[in-house]
Amino acid sequence: MKHWQPITQFLLKLFLVGSSLLFHAFSGSAQSWQQLLSELSETEDFEHTSWEDYEEDLEEWAQHPINLNAATREEMERLPFLTPSQVEDIQAYVYRYGGMKSITELTLIPSISWYQRQLMEHFFYVDADQKKSDFPSIRNIIKYGKHEAMGMLKVPFYERKGDTNGYLGYKYKHWLRYQFRYGDYVKLGVVGSQDAGEPFGAGKNNLGYDFYSFYLQVKKLGRWKNITLGRYRLHEGLGLILNNDFSFGKLSVLSSLGSASNRIRVHSSRSSVNYLQGAAATYTLLKGLDLTAFFSYRKIDATLSDQGGIRTIMKTGLHRTVKEIAKQNIASNTLMGGNINYRNQGWHVGATGFYTSFSLPLTPNQSQLYKRFAPQGNNFWNASVDYGYVSHRWTIAGETATGNSGAIATLNAASYLLTDHFSLLALQRFYSARYYSLFSNSFSEGSDVQDENGAYLGFTWIPAHRWSITGYSDFAYFVWPKYHTKQSTQCWDHLLNILYQPNKRWTLGTRLRYKEKAGTTTGRWRLYATFAEKNWSTKTSVDYTVSKEMGEKSSQKEADDANPSQGYLLNENLSYRWHWLRLSGSFSYFHTQDFSSRIYAYEPGLLYQMSFSSFYGEGIRCALVARSEIGKHLLVIAKLGSTNYFDRSHISTGLQEIATSHQTDLEIQMKWKW
């Protein structure tokens, strides 16, 4: 492809000088918390997680910040970028000096980095009043509660093959949500969601939308810390037996280790999978002693075996074709259990247990090696013990679990703050090949908490003011063959991330990652520069990826002779704020040899829609987001995104195939508050 060479040269020059051609008419920062958090996080952490759910939680927090002088440990530990030790330092400072007078006093706490302070300004404010408010009266809840109605419509300017023959619905995606809330005490809402291609108001969707979620949550009602009805998510312990909430990857664990792990969250997202339906509640028996109970009954999608059992539990949430609808709500699942945990002077210990059953037996195809130890039958149970300790220097956390398989899974980690600017984290996990839990989600290299032995060593270092260096090295060994393998495999994963902020406007960063797994070696490198003013911000980045697939039985010579797959991406993000209008734009040029050298990039999106996309092949991606706050009640956001490929005549395959080399979408979102 000769035509891309002049484009490459031009864009490379743009990268070298683009960050200098900026407006300097203002002072301050225009960076959003999403941009700041994306620079502290590892993009690939979000490939296998539902970032939308956690982003929604943080966005609501940013809209309703908390008084830092009155914030509880549990509230602060909800933030993914604060460690439990840092939370201890903040609370110790507030206690010692009788509260903060300004958010800038965070600079007096050595363990809080510059980037963390910038993020905290989005979620906290400082008020001298440190009194804890009593639960409001019903009259005040009704009178002073806040309402909001939201809607989103996505319009594609193209047709997929299934739109004309295959999908039973139209090509537009849309959703609606109503929510009522009173501070952090009461939250009530209902969501209706429709994916593109799903029938609206027809067939099984005679009530309109394909998916509805409803929820009611009451917090801080005397000894009742949390009462949640409807659809919700749970996170108990470190997730070895129960976590259908959000979890972070290997880089973010450096800050999230040991954070409050017994959480009940409402399921207010548009995702039609990975939620519980029923009731959950946490009650304080004694000071530091909490009891949680939960019950869930819900329908699930599944494919059936010839014997009528469940072959596979479907988690796509898509019901567009006759075949997909035939799998909809074909079975049911019941879950009941509880957790008890005790906290005192930095120590905590807890126990979790549950029983779950299916209306049809699980019958996986165990003739396939990687499914040899998959759960089978109707009824299952799991139990675990979690434990830990938090002080200024030490953070210790662990969980050990078992179940009706009789096998063991254990995860243990310890973090030590050698100085106020340097900390080490060591983590060990052993997940037996015979162990399973149908609701687990925890730290792992693989996709499941099963068949993995590993050790992880990470560090966080602030060598000087405005510097931040983080990194890790992780080793994992898989005894049993995985998908597409026939023997034991192992994985080495190393990452180094460096941030430098020479002044209040500039931020420079680089990230290096090297990974060997199942015969594939992948190296990734990123270099970026961010410049922020009061009304302007820009981020320029370059990504490079090289990947080599050697195969399980390749000799060393064959491995050395193998041609690597390479690729790069040049990206520019710009944002501008003027009174009631905020504009954000993103432009990317990518060129990779194949999917193995794909590259990930962040681009601005709508509310509750932090976007991390992957690109491979050759092409450009452009996105423009306009956000307008009209008065005190109406918010309108529009996003126009377009991808143009230079190396293909069509996009995707099957019913998702687009018969052109480009695709453009328009998304419109509106929120009315009163």
Regions found by a protein language model. Name each.
Residues 32-38, 111-122, 127-148, 162-165, ...:
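Outer-membrane beta-barrel biogenesis signature
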Residues 1-33, 674:
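Bacterial Sec-dependent N-terminal signal peptides
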